[in-house]
Amino acid sequence: MKITQFVFGLLAIFSPAVSAQQNHIVIENTNVRYCISAQGRNISFIDRASGVDYLKHDTTSACALVRCSDVEYPATSVFLVNGRLTIEFSEVNVKAVLHVESLNSYIRLTVESVSGDNIESLMFLNIPLTLKARPDESFGSCALSLNLITRVNQLPALQTSLQALCYDKFGIEGAKVAIVATPTEKILTTLKQVLTEADEMPHCIVAGPWANDVPFNHGSYLFNFGSLTESNVDEWISTARKLGVTQIDNHGGRNFFRFGDFVLNHKKWPQGWDTYRSIVKRLHDAGIGSIFHTYAFFIDKQSKYVTPVPDKRLDAFRTFTLAETIDSNDAEITVNESTSGMSTVTGFFEHNSVILHIGDELITFGAVSQEPPWQFTNVKRGAFGTKPASHKKGAKARHLKECFGLLVPNPNSSLLEEIARNHADIVNSCNFDGIYLDAIDGSSILRGPDECWYWADKFVFEIQKHLKKPVGMEMSAMWHHFWQFRTRWQAWDYPQRGHKRFIDIHAASVNSGLLLPLHLGWWNFQQFNPPQVEPTFPDVIEYLGAKLIGWDAGISLTGAIDPDRLATVPLFRRAVDTLCTCEELRRSNVFDERVKAKLREPGKEFSLFEDKSGKWRFRPAHYDSHTASLSEPWSLSWKTWNPFRKQPVKFRIETLMSAGSYYDANNITLADLSDLNQLTESQRSADGITVSLGETSNGPNGSVIFSAASSGKVPRNAAWARLDRRFSPCLNLKEHKAIGLWIDGDGQGQIIAIRLESPRHISYGAVADRYITVDFTGPRLFTLIETESARWSDYVWNDGKGLYNLYRETIDFDMVESLSIWYNNLPKDKQAKCIIGPVKAMPMVTCTVKNPVVTVNGKSIVLPVEMQSGSYLQFNEGNDCILYDSKGQILCRVIPNGDIPMLSAGENQVRFSCDAGDGSVPRLKLTVISHAEPF
């Protein structure tokens, strides 16, 4: 490698007319000049072409820091001689020597030596920048780690701060980083050069800085969970072509292949991976790529590493010592060490197991003592096909690690590398085109969250080292070293409600500084399944398709698209057709950047249509939804907004589920706030919020005055207070999924939220929220059924919840652990004061909407039809009015009575009515639709 030496050295200016501030160290190449004072403080980081200094000057920053005995110390002096930068930390008598190489397109720093006592870590690069790490900036910079022991926290390719660390536990000497600073348009080219010249890491020339050059990385894919066999390859090829996807993701587990040892289900693939090699070849011949999808280093409990003889390289939380000998039939195990705090709670995301490893036997336990004698009881011997045996006093019992229902290799053993090689062997043998390392977001189970970067990176390095050809990767997490092996960014799991808002949040979270091809995720389709799942109506899919085109992002479909489902659920078939069209339009690059910019605007909706010339076009659309119930007369009249020109109204009516009577004796009372003993915790609230409960004689028995006031310390949408009740044992609300609530409102505009939760290990932290906006005064009785999602994102809750908890996961109504009653959006310096009656769980029941009437600005249209819960009516224009069942099957065409009402530009008054029946109270959602001219 040819190294060009540029100016770098100690500039000692001896003229007394020159300020001592000029006595500093300069490290530079053709693009950037980095200046450090002799005292180790950053002075500047200058783009040599423009003269702009990108160093962040709001605070003084040290060029390096050392951590000793858990205290961090800044550099106190630096000097540069013959390409060696010596950094001293006089407060702790530590010295580090860096080899500095100024190359044509980047600068390389290597830690050559370090001396001192109690050194835990060394940050040998620290340059805070004013850059925003956006691709629209003219200048970009990146610190790129050049080996496994060098930690860089920020992701490539564009960064806001350049830092590099190394640790005593992994090795300090030899840590190495590249400083890249260049015009943004050249950053990927430069990073290609850096990685090509990096000799301590595997190379993958189809990922990272090369990713955008590879068509495969821009594709979309279809999931295969084990149904693709030799006998149906042609069907899969046909389906893929119909869907417009060019890849198949082969997701292991279940009845496909085991994680860890990757043994295929021999009933389906009798020749093992030899069979699958021929499947992949047939897909390749048809122009379809294949991805090998695993749960990273996690290990199936039926794998060879577990049964019949458990591998001693399986990792454990801790090790116990048998206090007495046990024979092969004993159902209790006594140990010397404390078992206090241990639990039998396990679940998908839980870091816990009920498995003990003693000798060559695995044992599960059903209970564990919290006080002496320390015992595991209700044990089952010879678990997972191991052999029960006697074990002597003093034998070691290891409590095995588990997450995602899978076991874990000890990362300090050879098993981590062995499983990595297993990946490479399968990919090499079958000629897979990509690897998806799912579950690697669980890497904290190895050695804690602060070491994820090292062990996860090590695992990826080991796979890449053994591949025979460059194979790119996707992963369920992201650390710095992953970027150079990553082909695309940012697949998320699909939402089950709040679809459009979720898409916008997903797109907004895209880290454009990664400069990788985009992927907007794993999608599935839903049909009517209340109260926690919302159907994916055509406008949802058009919204998704528009964003895919706008962002030039791929997509993947996880299920619901096999031929049988598409045949029996026309709603899904229409969704697939729309996505297929959008995918073809995206790949063909039909729309220019001006149109794409419109399509990717958050919240902006579009309808896709084919014009008379056969050309696909988008037109701006607006969907304004409102839920109404005949039992809530205030809900039957409302205002809707049309942002476009005056036009005939279009709408969709969805018949929802209803509920029984609030006063039914068979309801389950979830909270009677007049009984303060029901509250399991004291009231909680945001900063500056005061809360009180008061007695009242108004309202149903058990009513209280719930008061709260905000002093304004937090924004209004973050002004919350909550009351909580826990149920032990959990409540079974399987037949009581609706909520009834009586409220005497104060008209202050706050929201009241009713939240149900199941145990975390069962429902992954999901919540079932229902909201009421208190924009009214006086008493009202509410029936709450459908759970919230999008509106949760309008407020700050400080509840530790994330998007998946609200948009994706569902609670288990069979096991409801808690109820919370919230205020949020409390006004400043005003007391919110509502009377709240008992919160009741009520049965959901079906209802009928008969002969609905939609009135817009005083003009009505009557729809002579009966609609059952789950059905929906789509009225477009003229006589285009169709009633569908919950699967999207056409039930009948409806001929409306009356002239079509006109939507005015701006605000419009809407009213709904229908014939009353003998059954449950009709409930519905009416969505008013308007359009602008196409573009």
What residue spans do the PLM features occupy?
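Extracellular ligand-binding interfaces
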Residues: S710-Y807, A832-C834, P922, L926-F935
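Aromatic-lined carbohydrate-binding/catalytic grooves of carbohydrate-active enzymes
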Residues: P215-T319, K401-A424, N428-Y454
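Carbohydrate-recognition beta-sandwich/jelly-roll modules
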Residues: I27-G252, P270, R282, A286-S290, ...
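Short carbohydrate-recognition loop motifs
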Residues: L693-A721
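Autoprocessing Asn-cyclization modules and mimics
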Residues: A296, D300-R381, G385-P388
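Intrinsically disordered, low-complexity segments enriched in serine, threonine, and glycine
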Residues: V335, S343, R381-A389, K393, ...
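Glycan-recognition surfaces
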Residues: Y305-F317, K401-E418, E462-L566
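Extracellular beta-strand ligand-recognition surfaces/modules
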Residues: L122-L125, P648-F651, Y662-I668, L673, ...
